[in-house]
């Protein structure tokens, strides 16, 4: 197992490129199950979760392999069972449920695992699929689903669930009749999935709004598709520029998907602008804290909450962070406190007293975004920080040390 050793206090300057989106790649790769022809995905990040998904697709009958930055998938003899050995490591594996039911009329998917940052129940997925004619039972830790043919339905989500919207979006493409999804998630990754499905012959309208209409088609064909850039990686690099008092040009930055993040950075005193070649984020001599409340898109993303808390620790003044999406998403707080941060928790709210000089310390990552927060804190801290359990980080960031070192970071990966 590896750890990152970071010597902080160096402003980051230069150009850094954003990889393809993990959260767009996972459902789009799962959508391969719906196709009856080969497909090529470009701009796919080389991450642990992507490699796990490729292995899972192979077991399900869709052999997938990297060729350069592209993943080639060849759907062939489909298998309805997603085994526990792979599913236990990644919650997104439940996204194969809808496509399997749509193609085979059956699915046997182990109950999902992944980051321990909240319940993230799959009941929203199951109850919606039941309205389309599926039946489910839990058998020895597996979700077992069956149907003759999925039927179009009018479905309203109690909460704009991203995974639920994606699962139903995929299932409905091959269903009989029209499916309407109300209170659907509006995230850019949902739009990317819908755009991919349309490129394969699906009939979908309304993506990006809270009402999506899908008219089922007989089949979906293959295509070549480029995955959108990763808005959370881009946001993390934007915070890195601020927390190190640096100046970064971020290439392939999906600006339109980061309005809430960019505005909060401006509120804190950073220069953020679009220019030829990317998005510029520059420290302007002062950082002032702010308040953050996480919301579904287009609100402030929960996946950027931990990174902003690290930034608020070194900014002047007091700030509040309220987490409304997931419970248990403040596990990075105790590690930041070990580095000298002043953060107090009350329920789902964190009160951050800024203006602190963080100091290097051994810290332990508890989930993907918490690990990013600790890396950012290490970049700003005096002395040396050791971030342990970085397998969480590798699930969502493509060789982060190889991207940060060329812009001035002193960060290296070593065995524990």
Curated annotation (Swiss-Prot):
**According to its UniProt record, where is this protein located?**
Cytoplasm
What's any GO biological process attached to this entry? UDP-N-acetylgalactosamine biosynthetic process
- The UniProt record gives the binding positions of phosphoenolpyruvate as 22-23
UniProt name for this protein: UDP-N-acetylglucosamine 1-carboxyvinyltransferase
Q: What is its main location?
A: cytoplasm
Reactions catalysed, semicolon-separated, are:
phosphoenolpyruvate + UDP-N-acetyl-alpha-D-glucosamine = UDP-N-acetyl-3-O-(1-carboxyvinyl)-alpha-D-glucosamine + phosphate
Function summary: Cell wall formation. Adds enolpyruvyl to UDP-N-acetylglucosamine.
Q: Which UniProt keywords apply?
A: Cell cycle, Cell division, Cell shape, Cell wall biogenesis/degradation, Cytoplasm, Peptidoglycan synthesis, Pyruvate, Transferase
């Amino acid at each position: 197992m590896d750890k990152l050793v970071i010597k902080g206090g160096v402003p980051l300057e230069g150009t850094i490129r954003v990889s393809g989106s993990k959260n767009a790649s996972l459902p789009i790769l799962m959508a391969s199950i719906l196709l009856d022809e080969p497909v090529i995905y470009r701009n796919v990040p080389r991450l642990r979760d992507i490699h796990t998904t490729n292995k899972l697709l192979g077991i399900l009958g869709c052999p997938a392999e990297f060729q350069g930055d592209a993943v080639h998938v060849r759907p062939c003899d489909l298998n309805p069972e997603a085994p526990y050995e792979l599913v236990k490591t990644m919650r997104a594996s439940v996204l194969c449920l809808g496509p399997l039911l749509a193609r085979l009329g059956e699915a046997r998917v182990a109950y999902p695992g992944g980051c321990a940052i909240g319940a993230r129940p799959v009941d929203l997925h199951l109850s919606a699929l039941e309205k389309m004619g599926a039946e489910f039972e839990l058998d020895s830790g597996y979700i077992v689903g069956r149907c003759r043919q999925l039927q179009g339905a009018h479905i309203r989500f109690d909460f704009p669930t991203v995974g639920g919207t994606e699962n139903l979006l995929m299932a409905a493409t091959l269903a009989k009749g029209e499916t309407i999804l109300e209170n659907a998630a509006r995230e850019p990754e949902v739009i990317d999935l819908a755009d991919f499905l349309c490129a394969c012959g699906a009939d979908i309208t309304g993506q990006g709004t809270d009402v999506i209409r899908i008219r089922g088609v007989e089949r979906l064909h293959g295509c070549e598709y480029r995955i959108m850039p990763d808005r959370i990686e881009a946001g993390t690099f934007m915070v890195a520029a601020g927390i190190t008092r640096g100046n970064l040009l971020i290439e392939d930055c999906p600006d339109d998907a980061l309005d809430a993040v960019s505005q909060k950075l401006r509120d804190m005193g950073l220069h953020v602008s679009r220019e030829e070649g990317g998005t510029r984020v520059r420290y302007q001599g002062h950082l002032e804290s702010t308040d953050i409340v996480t919301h579904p898109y287009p609100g402030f993303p929960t996946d950027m909450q931990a990174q902003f808390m690290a930034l608020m620790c070194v900014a002047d003044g007091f700030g509040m962070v309220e987490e409304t999406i997931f419970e248990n998403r403040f596990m990075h707080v105790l590690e930041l406190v070990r580095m000298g941060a002043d953060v107090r928790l009350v329920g789902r709210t964190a009160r951050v007293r800024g203006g602190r000089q963080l100091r290097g310390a051994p810290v332990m990552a508890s989930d993907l975004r918490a690990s990013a927060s600790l890396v950012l804190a290490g970049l700003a801290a005096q002395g040396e920080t050791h971030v342990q359990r970085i397998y969480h980080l590798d699930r969502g960031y493509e060789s982060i040390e190889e991207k940060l070192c060329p812009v001035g970071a002193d960060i290296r990966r070593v065995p524990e």
